[in-house]
Regions:
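Single conserved hydrophobic/aromatic residue that forms the stacking wall/gate
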Residues: 1-8
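Short helix/strand-bridging catalytic loops that position acidic/His residues to coordinate divalent metals
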Residues: 11
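Radical SAM/AdoMet-radical enzyme domain recognition
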Residues: 17-20, 24-40, 49-172
Length: 172
């Protein structure tokens, strides 16, 4: 699997389970009588810290029962590390997914080259297509980003739909 150039820089900055647990506890403690809460895994690439993501999801489920809460969880990923095991776990645990794809191939590869400058689009599209095909009705959408390099972003939206992603969002 190809890694983006910045991934080694951020490995030492990954959140520990202790910090994640305290964040969940804070959310529950400060949600008052509110039954429904939300927790989002995003920033950097959450799947680089997969073990902590799993621990946190398991902890949230235990705390939901203990405190009578319903916590909707979502995870934003670039899809590079999204494999069958992760898709199954996230789907089985009802985690909403925001799948990030920076437009069509030439746009995406320009914005997100691999560690050696190679394109990542083909591998990511393959991973996202597998994910979407195996969501079993669980929520997801593919989020594209438009920049000064793809002001014709409608072309990117059409490309995403043509790749089998009917749930698409575009963001600046």
């Amino acid at each position: 699997s190809t890694l983006f150039p910045y991934t080694t820089l951020f490995r030492s900055m990954l959140m520990s389970f202790d910090v994640a647990r305290r964040a969940v506890d804070f959310l529950i403690a400060h949600s008052g009588p509110r039954e429904h809460c939300e927790l989002d895994f995003f920033g950097g690439e959450p799947l680089m810290n997969w073990h902590v993501v799993q621990q946190t999801i398991d902890y949230v489920h235990k705390q939901e029962k203990k405190h009578g809460k319903k916590i909707k969880m979502s995870l934003t990923t670039n899809g590079l590390l999204l494999d069958k095991e992760k898709v199954k776990y996230l789907t089985d645990n009802h985690i909403s997914l925001i799948l990030s794809l920076d437009g069509r191939k030439e746009m995406h590869d320009r914005m997100r080259p691999g560690v050696h400058g190679e394109g990542t689009y083909d591998e990511i599209v393959k991973n996202l297509q597998y994910c979407v095909a195996n969501r079993k009705g669980e929520e997801y959408y593919v989020r594209g980003t438009f920049t000064r390099y793809n002001m014709d972003f409608t072309t990117d939206v059409i490309d995403m739909i043509d790749k089998g992603f009917p749930a698409v969002s575009m963001e600046p």
